[in-house]
Amino acid sequence: GHSAYIISTILARHGFSKSFHIFDSFEGGLSDKTSEDVSDYARQTKEEAEFEKNWFSSTINDLKKALIGFDFIEIYKGWIPDRFPEVESKKFAFVHVDVDLYQPTLDSLKFFYPRLLPGGVIVVDDYGYSVFPGAKRAVDEFLRGTDCSVFYETPMGSCFIIK
């Protein structure tokens, strides 16, 4: 919800009039890690995994409350990529992927990049974070088969993919 609030605030200040689509399970989600998501030094106890899942979850009502007043937001509750068909016919100028894990990151890139307008930007929030190695693996795998105009890794761990 923090990223959605920051992005919404910036968009509102600049007179944004398009739709801002937010996809979230509202169930945490770090419990569905695969071998692609585990770093060698980030092994967890069951208690640590449960804490992590709860740390990254919020309710849809909490999000709606935080984003009240931003009438351009559309929220899709569900798992990635299950809800993507609802926006299959749309084009996107900006996509912010903050899903931490390999498979939903890869699914997001495969779905949104072909629908990205020329010059459009995809930001992958967790690309450079060692605790989320799956995000980097997904981006690197995706880029091997994609001709993007620009790829830029920020010093803060995100990356930008520009079509």
Language-model segments: residues:
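S-adenosylmethionine/decaboxylated-SAM
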Residues: 1-163
